[in-house]
C-alpha cells in the first residue's frame, strides 16, 4: 500500500517497475530489426536482482511459454513489450526534435533506469538532469560506471522525491530557468495522485521559459479496467510458470477518476499541447499486436502528450 512519504530502491515498490520496463527494452534491442536500441538495459536488469519474474521477462521464448498456457495473455505480454518499444521510440524522437530546435537543457522526471543520457546522440553543450529517488539513481550510475559506460552528455543527478522541493534541488544542481528546456514524464503520472500531478506540472510551468517543451505519458479513462483484466491473467500464468511476483503494480497506482486530462490542463495553463494515442502510434510504426483485451477501446490505452510553452 502506498503512503504519502514512501520510498524505494531499485528492487522494491515503484523502483522495481523500472526493471520491468528495462527488460522490455532489452528484449526489443536484441531483435533483428529493433525499433529502439538500448545496449545497457539488459545489464541494468540482471544486476538489479529485483526478482525472478523481472529477469524472466528477458527470455525471448517467454511469449511462446505463456501461449501454451493462455493465448490472450501471451498476446498481452507481446503487446506490453511492443508498447514499451513504441513509447521509448516516441520519446527518443521527441528529444531528437528538441535538440534539433536548439534546446540544450533536458530534465527527465522519475528517470528510473532510463539510459538516454548515455545512449542518445546529444549535441555538444547538452546537460541532462535526472530526478529520482537517491537509491535508484545510485544503482544506475554505479552499475554503468562499473561496466565502463560513460554519459554522452553532461549528466547531473538530482536525488530527490518529486513530492519534496525538487525545483530547489534542480536549481541547486545548475538548472537555468531562463534557458529552454525539454522535459519528460514517462511512466510516472499513474504513480502520482491527481493533486500531485497538477502540482508537478504547475512547478514545471514556473521553471519553463517560452519555447520549452514537455512530453508525458498519460493513462486513458478506461485503463484501470484493462489493467485489472491483465492483472488477473498475469497472476495465473505466473503461478503456472512458478514465477514469484514480488510486487503488484496495480497496488502502486493511484486510481483517480477526477484526474484532469493532461493535454487539456496544459492548454489551459500556458502550453500548446497535442496528444497521440498509443494505439495509433503502435499502428503507425507497425508494432500493434492483435488479440489483446479491449483492443477496440482507445480510452483503455495511453496517450503520448507533447506541448510547447507559449
UniProtKB/Swiss-Prot annotation:
Question: Does ATP-binding show up as a keyword for this record?
Answer: no
The enzyme class is: transferase
Q: What is its EC number?
A: 2.1.1.-
Q: Is Transferase given among the entry's keywords?
A: yes
Sorted keywords for this record are:
Methyltransferase, S-adenosyl-L-methionine, Transferase
Q: Name one GO biological process term.
A: methylation
Q: Please indicate which superkingdom the organism of origin belongs to.
A: Bacteria
Q: Which residues bind S-adenosyl-L-methionine?
A: 132, 161-162
Which Pfam families does the protein's record reference? LCM
Q: Which GO terms describe its molecular function?
A: methyltransferase activity
The function of this protein is: Exhibits S-adenosyl-L-methionine-dependent methyltransferase activity.
- In which family does this protein belong, per the annotation? Belongs to the UPF0677 family.
For this entry, the protein name equals Putative S-adenosyl-L-methionine-dependent methyltransferase MUL_4762
Amino acid at each position: 500500500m502506498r503512503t504519502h512519504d514512501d520510498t524505494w530502491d531499485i528492487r522494491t515498490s515503484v523502483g522495481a517497475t523500472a526493471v520491468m520496463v528495462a527488460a522490455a527494452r532489452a528484449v526489443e534491442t536484441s531483435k533483428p530489426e529493433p525499433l529502439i536500441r538500448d545496449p545497457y538495459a539488459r545489464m541494468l536488469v540482471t544486476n538489479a536482482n529485483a526478482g525472478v519474474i523481472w529477469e524472466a521477462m528477458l527470455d525471448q521464448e517467454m511469449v511462446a511459454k505463456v501461449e501454451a498456457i493462455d493465448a490472450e495473455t501471451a498476446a498481452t505480454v507481446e503487446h506490453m513489450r511492443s508498447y514499451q518499444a513504441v513509447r521509448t521510440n516516441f520519446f527518443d524522437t521527441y528529444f531528437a526534435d528538441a535538440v534539433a530546435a536548439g534546446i540544450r537543457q533536458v530534465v527527465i522526471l522519475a528517470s528510473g533506469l532510463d539510459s538516454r543520457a548515455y545512449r542518445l546522440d546529444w549535441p555538444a553543450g547538452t546537460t541532462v538532469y535526472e530526478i529520482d529517488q537517491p537509491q535508484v539513481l545510485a544503482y544506475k550510475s554505479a552499475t554503468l560506471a562499473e561496466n565502463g559506460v560513460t554519459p554522452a552528455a553532461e549528466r547531473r543527478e538530482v536525488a530527490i522525491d518529486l513530492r519534496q522541493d525538487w525545483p530547489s534541488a534542480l536549481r541547486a544542481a545548475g538548472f537555468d530557468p531562463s534557458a529552454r528546456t525539454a522535459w519528460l514524464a514517462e511512466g510516472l503520472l499513474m504513480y502520482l495522485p491527481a493533486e500531485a500531478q497538477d502540482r508537478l506540472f504547475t512547478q514545471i510551468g514556473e521553471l519553463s521559459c517560452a519555447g520549452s517543451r514537455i512530453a508525458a505519458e498519460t493513462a486513458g479513462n478506461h485503463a484501470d479496467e484493462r489493467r485489472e483484466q491483465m492483472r488477473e491473467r498475469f497472476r495465473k500464468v505466473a503461478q503456472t510458470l512458478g514465477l514469484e511476483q514480488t510486487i503488484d503494480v496495480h497496488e502502486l497506482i493511484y486510481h483517480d477518476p477526477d484526474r484532469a486530462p493532461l493535454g487539456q490542463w496544459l492548454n489551459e495553463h500556458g502550453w500548446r499541447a497535442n496528444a497521440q494515442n498509443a494505439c495509433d502510434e503502435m499502428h503507425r510504426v507497425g508494432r500493434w499486436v492483435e488479440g489483446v483485451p479491449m483492443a477496440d477501446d482507445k480510452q483503455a490505452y495511453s496517450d503520448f502528450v507533447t506541448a510547447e510553452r507559449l
